[in-house]
Swiss-Prot record:
GO terms for cellular component: cytoplasm. GO terms for molecular function: 3-phosphoshikimate 1-carboxyvinyltransferase activity. This is 3-phosphoshikimate 1-carboxyvinyltransferase. Belongs to the EPSP synthase family. Phosphoenolpyruvate binds at residues 23, 97, 125, 172, 346, 388, 413. HAMAP family: EPSP_synth. The keyword Transferase applies. GO terms for biological process: amino acid biosynthetic process; aromatic amino acid family biosynthetic process; chorismate biosynthetic process. The active site is at residue 314. Monomer. Transmembrane segments: none annotated.
Length: 429
């Protein structure tokens, strides 16, 4: 019997939430700190499955670190250069793309015999574009099961040089190459083929590399130049921003049934592109206020929108369920093909589950159209082992209809106490 959680109708949502650390920033920071010269103290680190997988892998690679009892402060002693692996290793990375992709690249700097594997879903998430790019730079990589997918066997060999990478599926491939290139023997020039998706995530990478002492020349997101034979330097203390994707559920909830909700840990100067989610809520009719380290949202009458969501693919999922509460017809979210290669095929999953609560849905190859029903229906929502599906569909409870979330613990990937925090800010009908 699958575990489930039934959320009763919520009449008001109000209060302040201190956001858990960003998954994207946490795993990048751990890797950069491990490769750096010196000790780094990371604060507000996310405690979640994906981060635990990265920490376990780093420990297996000989990185020494100390975690606080609540696992949000981590002191890491950097290696001062690339990993070394004296004996064969197998690293299990769960379903953590933010560990699999960057480690696949970084471990190509070391001669060894390292296998990267993960959960069944990880073996369905494409990595061929990254492998092709690494091979152009001299890396020796074998597919152990299916061509273009993990598990991978790495034998080092990456030297840098001229590389082209397809940018149309995942920005994590480019992030992985950028973070590895400074430690290569040669300078690296990376040319992007196709349209680069999720550009703001590349900005996070570049911003963080700079914090760890490395400059990258970015030519309009078409070409990137990175000098080789460099060294990352620890910034000493590094504060991990709150997770802007996690903020989206609470900001949307306030837009639908506020009160006022304030999320702290992100603000107008955040490095994360997903803060732009608040602009989308504002376009729909919510009232949004920005501070240095907070975003606040207040209820407004929400209207349907038609928008390109390529810049905020993760947070855009929250708009899909917020659309159930929009007046004036059909909401269209465009240019979201990369939903299909995430924790699950999110486009297909979203369409199936939105129909269960009564919405009329058109699912395109790279878009979704959502027309809300006059009244939402109570339903059991499948979550596909995808943390964002569980959190998105919790918003259905902001109607006068309860909703049942199957496998609610899947939020542990990024937000283990999500449902407790939602309950804390909620007043039930």
């Amino acid at each position: 019997m699958q575990e489930s959680l039934t959320l009763q109708p919520i009449k008001l949502i109000n209060g302040t939430l201190n956001l858990p650390g960003s998954k994207s920033v946490s795993n990048r920071a751990l890797l950069l700190a491990a490769l750096s010269e010196g000790k780094t103290r990371l604060t507000n680190l996310l405690d979640s499955d994906d981060v635990r997988h990265m920490l376990t892998a780093l420990a297996a690679l000989g990185v020494e670190y100390h975690l606080s009892s609540d696992r949000t402060v981590c002191e890491i002693t950097g290696l001062g250069g690339a990993f070394t692996a004296s004996q064969p290793l197998e690293l299990f990375l769960g379903n953590a793309g933010t560990a699999m992709r960057p480690l696949a690249a970084a471990l190509c700097l070391t001669d060894g015999d390292i296998v990267l594997t993960g959960e069944p879903r990880m073996k369905e998430r494409p990595i061929g574009h990254l492998v092709d790019a690494l091979r152009q730079g001299g890396a020796k990589i074998d597919y152990l099961e299916q061509e273009n997918y993990p598990p991978l066997r790495l034998h080092g060999g990456f030297q840098g040089g001229e590389i082209s990478v397809d940018g149309s599926v995942s920005s994590q491939f480019l992030t992985a190459l950028l973070m590895t290139a400074p430690l290569a023997a040669q300078d690296t020039q990376i040319s992007i083929q196709g349209d680069l998706v999720s550009k703001p995530y590349i900005d996070i990478t570049l911003h963080m590399m700079k914090a760890f002492g490395i400059e990258v020349r970015n030519e309009n997101y078409q070409r990137f130049f990175v000098a080789g034979r460099q060294q990352y330097r620890s910034p000493g203390d590094y504060l991990v921003e709150g997770d802007a994707s996690s903020a989206s559920y609470f900001l949307a909830a306030a837009a639908i049934k506020g009160g006022v909700v304030r999320v702290t840990g992100v603000g107008r100067n955040s490095v994360q592109g997903d803060i732009r989610f608040a602009d989308v809520l504002e376009r729909m009719g919510a009232i949004v206020r920005w501070g240095e380290d907070y975003i606040e949202c207040e209820r407004g009458e929400l209207h349907a929108i038609d928008m390109d969501m390529n810049h905020i693919p993760d947070a855009a999922m929250t708009i899909a369920t917020a659309a159930l509460f929009a007046q004036g017809g059909t909401t269209t979210l465009r240019n979201i093909y990369n939903w299909r290669v995430k924790e699950t095929d999110r486009l297909a999953a979203m369409a199936i589950e939105l129909r269960k609560v009564g919405a009329e849905v058109e699912e395109g190859n790279d878009y979704i159209r959502i027309t809300p029903p006059a009244k939402l229906k109570a339903a059991e929502i499948g979550t596909y082992n995808d943390h964002r599906m569980a959190m998105c569909f919790s918003l259905v409870a902001l109607s006068d209809t309860p909703v049942t979330i199957l496998d609610p613990k899947c939020t542990a990937k990024t937000f283990p106490d999500y449902f407790e925090q939602l309950a804390r800010l909620s007043e039930l009908a």
